[in-house]
Amino acid sequence: MEFKILKILVPGKYGSGTSSICRRFSENKFIIKRTSRIGIDFVRKVIHYKENQFTIQLWEEAHNERFNTISRRYYRNSNGFLLVFTPTERSSIEYIKNENEYIMSNAKTKNNVKYLIESKSDLCEKREVSKEEAIAVSKEYGYKYFECSALTGENVHEIVHCIMRDIIEVELLSKNDKKYLTNKDRNNKCIIF
């Protein structure tokens, strides 16, 4: 059995649900009270996949301009990005559009796996950002698009498993390390709506 750490950054505007998604993934519970962070925070969880052990680290940044320089350093060593926005606040999708620029200039490679995550899918009746607009943004930047709810737990674990498989395919197979995925796995694409 081999062991690998996968570092996934989870940027998003304050209040978009990044902390709730991270906690739902790591602890499988929803925490109502939001706390302010200083700098950067992460959660981790061990996942067994194809007779190998992966530690998935979800890193989220403080939503404070003073710490942007610190946060951007973490982009260089990341394997992927879950860019989170809430459809209930238009400014959160604008934040993602700006964040794309930082990712492209600070990530170690342009081939990092990037997903656009619509959080709070349980609040769709309060939409300010249509599903069609979100899908258009994801296509414009070459991101895969997913919806989830940290409150209900809908799709949170599935999204992390999908990005894990995509990272393995992009990074490990690019190093000719074919033992992680079979042909069947390569044909199994994640699509969650």
Question: Where are each of the predicted segments found?
Answer:
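TRAFAC-class small GTPase G-domain
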Residues: 1-175, 193
